[in-house]
Amino acid sequence: TDFMLSELKKGDSVCVMGAPKEANEKYEAFFIEWNKKRVKKGVSLKILYNHDSKEFGKKREKLPLTEVRYMKKELETPAWVDLFHDYVVTLNVHTTPVCFVIKNKETAQSYKEYFNVLWKQAKK
């Protein structure tokens, strides 16, 4: 989101956990523009896509400052989580879009540790 980009500066990173196919289908144009701005700002991205989102992951793999992996099928959910600084942003666009933001250092660190475990298990 624009809020996220406003909080980030060159050298920062974003981790995305569980990017679902449905969200990419609905918001692909937005994600393309957001990623252009992110790359221009010098912000790196590590994204764990749901298993069924490979067509979108293949597009993102070509972007600078971007690493992509895919979660196991049994871990797929309609919601996803964005992690940056002390923020945990959870989104779900399955039916009525829902988004909530937590700003808490300990909570963000817990989610990042979970992300790192999943990242190590995920496939390229």
Name each region found by the language model.
Residues 1-26:
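Interdomain hinge/linker segments and adjacent boundary elements that couple functional modules
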Residues 1, 23-124:
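PLD/PLD-like phosphodiesterase catalytic module centered on the HKD motif
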